[in-house]
A protein has these predicted regions:
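Membrane-interface junctions
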Residues: 3, 284, 339-343
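Interfacial loop/helix-cap signal at membrane boundaries in integral membrane proteins
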Residues: 294-344
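Active-site-proximal structural scaffolding
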Residues: 8-11, 161, 326, 330
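Soluble non-transmembrane domains of integral membrane proteins
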Residues: 65-316
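Subset of Sec-pathway N-terminal targeting signals
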Residues: 1-43, 145
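Low-complexity, proline/glycine-enriched hydrophobic segments characteristic of transmembrane helices
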Residues: 33-38, 46, 294-300
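Hydrophobic alpha-helical transmembrane segments of multi-pass integral membrane proteins
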Residues: 11-15, 166, 346-349
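Short, Gly/Pro- and small/polar-rich lid/capping loops
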Residues: 38-62
């Protein structure tokens, strides 16, 4: 590399560092810890729980894997067991020299569950025993109620990337009422060295009206919550460097209660992100039951390609008035530099 090339690279590095220092959004100082009482949306407890098929089946665990993630699924509830990123690892594993990938979902502490209203009572899908069949990159589960009605769940993992397609087919089930209920919860674990920064994990969402993006406060020391009484096109759990997203395909969530709770005395589950979501049972009966999960890095070049309106806004590039400069100059320049240096460590957040 000649002298002019070295000089050029040094100037580019200086420009990036100067931009980061003078223009990047400053972190908001942590507020004093306080307790917020929040109202949450929960299913009514007056409905009886419907009986399920009493034939107990042995649990099976299925694995879907591509070049980027490993997904494990259980026939017990046709549910997610774990989602692991293959090419990333936590700070703890890095410090200890372990090669294990980084988990963004683990059923031991996290939850994704669906509750359906039926003529016989409410059905918690996670309580059903399913029979599973795997064919290539797809796993399909079939469960049967005591009434003989069946529910089918399927998961499809593409050959690469961080998206997981999920479908719940309940068209043969006699659903009653106008809504069904989704509960999604994640216990945020420490993946980087600075635990205070990681406690700024939050919940992002996109309102259907005018595709308006918003989020809960990124406060590391106090509870943040929001009751959304209007429809949303997607909801995501945003950490500093990683993201978990839930995107309904062809329909929108009717409402949601969102809560982010820092666990100040817990060094393992450092923050709880919780979304209690209401969706239309009529949509479900009509076959509008496809979802897409995103489990991956909070990388603009990846997140912006997800086929969901304004999903790229999960990555905070800069202040709004500087966004065009960041988006069309610095992001492409950053990508070019990364193509030259395999160990390029600068990061614009």
């Amino acid at each position: 590399m000649d002298r002019n090339s070295i000089t050029g690279i040094v100037l580019i590095m200086g420009m990036l560092l100067g931009y980061q220092y003078f223009f990047a959004p400053k972190e908001i100082p942590a507020a004093k810890a306080n307790v917020v009482t929040q109202k949450v949306i929960t299913p009514k407890d007056t409905a009886k729980v419907v009986a399920i098929d009493s034939t107990v089946k042995q649990e099976q665990v299925f694995t879907l894997e591509n070049k980027d993630i490993i997904v494990k699924l259980s026939s017990k509830g046709a549910k997610l067991v774990s989602v692991q990123l293959k090419n990333y690892k936590s700070y703890a594993n890095f410090k200890e020299g372990k090669t294990d990938g980084l988990y963004l979902y683990n059923a031991a502490s996290d939850e994704f569950s669906i509750e359906l209203p039926t003529a016989a009572g409410k059905v918690k899908v996670a309580n059903l025993d399913f029979a599973g069949v795997q064919s290539g990159n797809k796993v399909q589960f079939t469960g049967t109620l005591a009434s003989g009605q069946s529910i089918t769940s399927s998961y499809v993992l593409p050959e690469k990337g961080f998206l997981l397609d999920y479908q719940l087919d309940a068209k043969s089930v006699a659903l009653t009422g106008g809504d069904y209920f989704i509960h999604w919860k994640e216990q945020v674990h420490q993946t980087e060295k600075d635990i205070t920064e990681e406690r700024k994990a939050t919940i992002n969402y996109l309102l259907s009206e005018d595709d308006e993006f918003d989020n809960l406060s990124e406060n590391p020391s106090s509870v943040a919550n929001e009751n959304l009484d209007q429809s949303t096109k997607w909801i995501s759990f945003k950490k500093k460097y990683f993201l978990s997203g839930l995107i309904p395909q062809g329909f929108a969530f009717k409402s949601a209660a969102l809560t982010a709770t820092p666990n100040l005395t817990d060094s393992v589950n450092i923050k709880t992100l919780d979304a209690q979501i209401i969706a239309s049972a009529q949509d479900l009966s009509a076959g509008k039951s496809n979802f897409t999960f995103y489990f991956g890095p909070n990388d603009y070049s990846i997140v912006n390609k997800v086929e969901a309106p304004n999903f790229g806004k999960n990555v905070k590039l800069s202040y709004d008035f500087l966004l065009p400069i960041t988006k069309y100059i610095f992001v492409p320049l950053f990508g070019f530099l990364e193509s030259l240096f395999s160990n390029y460590g600068l990061l614009i957040v």
